[in-house]
UniProtKB/Swiss-Prot annotation:
Swiss-Prot/TrEMBL keywords: Cytoplasm, Iron, Metal-binding, Nucleus, Oxidoreductase
Primary location group: cytoplasm
Catalytic reaction list: [3Fe-4S](1+)-[protein] + Fe(2+)-[Dph3] = [3Fe-4S](0)-[protein] + Fe(3+)-[Dph3]; 2 [3Fe-4S](0)-[protein] + 2 Fe(2+)-[Dph3] + NADH = 2 [4Fe-4S](1+)-[protein] + 2 [Dph3] + NAD(+) + H(+)
Quaternary structure (record): Component of the 2-(3-amino-3-carboxypropyl)histidine synthase complex composed of dph1, dph2, dph3 and a NADH-dependent reductase, predominantly cbr1.
Family, as annotated: Belongs to the DPH3 family.
Domain notes: The DPH-type metal-binding (MB) domain can also bind zinc. However, iron is the physiological binding partner as zinc binding impairs the protein electron donor function.
Keyword Oxidoreductase in annotation: yes
Pfam families: Zn_ribbon_CSL
Cofactor: Fe(2+)
InterPro entries named in the record: DPH3/4-like, DPH_MB_dom, DPH_MB_sf
Stated name of the protein: Diphthamide biosynthesis protein 3
């Protein structure tokens, strides 16, 4: 989706957003009373539009990849397989 086709409510610096480490999302208050949300994985893959789940408003998140928290490596449990 091209940004020109979207109706963007505002542009917000990522430093002004709140990061929820448990849910791995950034959020920012929406005028409707809910909040804009965007997943950190979406940001890592180049997505920069946060949406409000309660209304039609969207914001553009201004950030550099270096602004994002380091990606946590998920440890996998070793599984032994006997043939």
């Amino acid at each position: 989706m091209a940004d020109e086709a979207l109706s963007i409510y505002d542009e917000i610096e990522i430093e002004d957003m709140t990061f929820d480490a448990n849910l791995q999302i950034y959020h920012y208050p929406c005028p409707c009373g809910d909040r804009f949300e965007i997943a950190i994985d979406d940001l890592r893959y180049g997505e920069d539009i946060a949406v409000c789940p309660s209304c039609s408003l969207m914001i553009k998140v201004i950030f550099d990849q270096s602004d994002l928290p380091k990606e946590e490596k998920k440890e996998t449990e070793g599984v032994s397989v006997k043939a």
